[in-house]
A protein has these predicted regions:
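Substrate/ligand-engaging "lid" and interaction regions
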Residues: 1-44, 48-528
């Protein structure tokens, strides 16, 4: 069983389907021919998340028979991905959704019609220019990570041949401008708040520099700013797509699926002909398009207003997912866990995040309307976090915790204060913040040391709690005032919020000695 059998037509469909593989229900070659002539969508970033989500939902849309164009992928960073993960398989891939019950769903993705290297050294660049000049193009999109939208003075100074992704995109938009100021929507699909603004800032930085240097007419910048021509909508995307999993490779090999080799590029991109991802997924997109759009709603995407996209993001990062992640990661590191899924088998930790979510954060949740917060958090607790296929670690999530606490917990505390709600309902959120002062010591509950995860404020905050010792009977905890009064770390001055003394008391319990973290966690969770 090989992907190229599907491309050649030499495929025993009954065998594939008997083994649980969903095959494309559309004419792959007809879609490619149509897309080559009248492209509608170019996506930048050919990594695992693209194949597992945007390409997969377009595949679902094509399977309905109500749409007939594919997506053209362009890689700006790691060109080996095109050579090794796309070209040998005629741009086909296998999407494997990993279910929390240990089963897997297998779907052949055939929606990618071309895979191009987005750089001037390749002939693919001329193909991209040709596509950008085509009036049929409706949308370009991105999964290049938040770092992919950055730029620097050196690249801005390279003129019309920059090397950073945003510069290349600006150069292609210049081609579209020169072809008659054709309309287009520039859509980020990266997992960061207000992602459309990040693309916009990057593109505008290059355009403004080029205008200032006299390389392009001022009308080009006017074109980019004209929202009847060019828009930069926001979106919220949520789907975990880890590197190819050994267990998945073994399951596919048992089926007789032969395209299961791991690929590691020189730039250390980990990929394969298959991509594995969690089963749960969300894509909510601001419906602000200037030249029509691919009907991704046929594959499950939600189109809505910018305000609603922002509400979905707020629901996720302040209530239904991110606070739970951080709480269990702080305590998970101290209790010696290395897998989030393993933490979910710990009754104290599972109850801890359930009660934070349902009892403390939910009373002030932002309800976006298009997604139900209770269904969302239910999927997080019952399907996403316990998923045995997800190799996520508390140590990874604990990275940059000082930068995350203001949003993940500070916003909830602010809402309690603004609405005059009873702060006595806040017990486990304060326990999370108390746990941070214990986490900073880098000592597990069994007394052994651990390395706190990288954080730009780690040394500064560790210095504040340096006078404290785990297991010392009598000690001065006044240093905590310098920590919990920091609105830059917690979103609010916790003493002004009326929570500082409560948190101090919890810290004292956590510092009592070996076993105190477990004892304190159990005490407060059980009493809730």
């Amino acid at each position: 069983m090989k992907l190229n059998d599907i491309w050649s037509g030499n495929v025993n469909a009954a065998e594939w389907e008997a083994k649980g593989y969903e095959l494309p229900k559309f004419d792959i070659k007809a879609v490619r021919e149509k897309t080559a002539k009248e492209p509608t969508w170019v996506h930048f970033g050919g990594g695992n998340i693209f194949r597992a989500f945007p390409a997969a939902i377009l595949n679902d849309a094509l399977n309905t028979g109500k749409y007939d164009r594919g997506v053209i992928v362009a890689e700006t960073f790691d060109f080996e991905v095109i050579d090794k993960a796309y070209a040998p398989y005629n741009n086909l891939s296998l999407c494997v959704n990993l279910c929390s019950d240990g089963s897997i769903e297998k779907k052949v993705i055939a929606s990618v019609t071309e895979a191009l290297k987005a750089d001037y050294q390749f002939t693919d660049w001329q193909r991209l220019v040709e596509i950008f000049k085509n009036p049929s193009l409706q949308m370009i999109s991105f999964t290049i990570t938040e770092k992919g939208y950055t730029y620097n003075d050196a690249d801005l100074a390279r003129g019309l041949t920059p090397v950073f992704a945003m510069g290349k995109v600006c150069a292609l938009l210049l081609e579209r401008f020169n072809a008659g100021q054709l309309p287009l929507t520039v859509q980020s699909m990266d997992n960061c708040s207000h992602n459309g603004d990040k693309v916009k800032a990057g593109v505008f930085a290059y355009a403004e520099k080029w205008v200032a240097d006299g390389l392009v007419p001022a009308a080009f910048l006017d074109y980019l700013k004209d929202e009847t021509k060019i828009t930069f909508p926001w979106s919220m995307i949520d789907k975990i797509t880890p590197r190819p999993h050994e267990k998945v490779k073994e399951m596919l090999a048992t089926d007789g699926f032969e395209d299961n080799d791991y690929i590691e590029t020189e730039k250390h991109t980990f990929t394969a002909p298959f991509v594995n991802a969690e089963e749960v997924q969300y894509l909510v997109i601001e419906d602000n398009y200037t030249n029509g759009r691919p009907p991704l709603n046929l594959g499950g995407a939600l189109y809505t207003t910018r305000e609603t996209v922002d509400k979905v993001e707020t629901m996720k990062v302040t209530t239904c997912l991110n606070p739970l992640h951080t709480a269990m990661s702080i305590y998970g590191c101290m209790l010696g866990y290395t897998l989030i899924s393993a933490e979910m088998a710990d009754d104290d930790l599972r109850s801890f995040i359930q009660k934070i979510g349902y009892m403390e954060a939910m009373p002030v949740v932002t309800d976006p309307g298009v997604l139900n917060p209770y269904e969302f958090i239910g999927a997080v607790i019952n399907r996403r976090l316990p998923n045995p296929f997800m190799p996520d670690a508390p140590q990874r999530i604990a990275m940059d915790t000082s930068q995350k606490l203001p949003i993940r917990f500070g916003e909830t505390i602010k809402k309690y204060l603004a609405r005059g709600l009873d702060k006595s309902n806040l017990v486990l959120i304060p326990l999370t913040l108390a746990g941070y002062a214990r986490y900073l010591k880098g000592i597990k509950d069994d007394g052994t040391s651990f390395e706190p995860s990288p954080d730009p404020m780690l040394a500064e905050l560790q210095a504040i709690v340096a006078p404290l010792e785990v297991g010392k009977a009598e000690q001065d905890y006044s240093c905590l005032k310098s920590l919990y009064s920091r609105a830059d770390v917690f979103g609010v001055n916790l003493y002004d919020a009326g929570l500082g003394e409560q948190i101090e008391g919890m810290v004292k319990e956590l510092y009592a000695g070996n076993g105190a973290v477990r004892k304190t966690l159990h005490k407060y969770v059980a009493a809730r």
